[in-house]
Amino acid sequence: MSLMDPLADALTNIRNNELQVKDSCVISPASKLIGEVLSTMQKENYIGNFEYIDDNRAGQFKVELEGNINKCGVIKPRHAVKKDEFEKFEKRYLPAKNFGILIVTTPEGIMTHYEAKERGIGGRLLAYMY
């Protein structure tokens, strides 16, 4: 298996384990980006706790699943979004208004599109989930 996009592989792993109604999953390899995305998902109650496991290679994340994810995935290409353009991408990737989140990387860190709208900053879209 080739790892061209570790974030896409991580979200696919989470989605597949959610569909199989499993309690937890292991994401490998670990990275700072995946850790930040997982912490954003945890703040929004899509997943439970997660922990980093050092396996003397690339590391792993063990994620507790809550069963709250219907669908999740990465957004490719990583669209640059201005602070007033989020609604266009909400219509494209989310099923209804105020249902689900877009995960955005901004100069202030990784956050949901709701937080980015409140702060009045733009960024690049990484992922969606609902």
UniProtKB/Swiss-Prot annotation:
Disulfide bonds: none
Gene Ontology CC annotations of this record: ribonucleoprotein complex; ribosome
An example molecular function term from Gene Ontology annotations: rRNA binding
Database matches in NCBIfam families: PRK04034.1 (NF003115)
One GO process term, biological-process aspect: translation
The protein, known as: Small ribosomal subunit protein uS8
Pfam families: Ribosomal_S8
InterPro entries: Ribosomal_uS8, Ribosomal_uS8_CS, Ribosomal_uS8_sf
Domain of life where this protein originates: Archaea
Assembly, per entry: Part of the 30S ribosomal subunit.
UniProt function note: One of the primary rRNA binding proteins, it binds directly to 16S rRNA central domain where it helps coordinate assembly of the platform of the 30S subunit.
Family indicated by similarity: Belongs to the universal ribosomal protein uS8 family.
Record keywords: Ribonucleoprotein, Ribosomal protein, RNA-binding, rRNA-binding
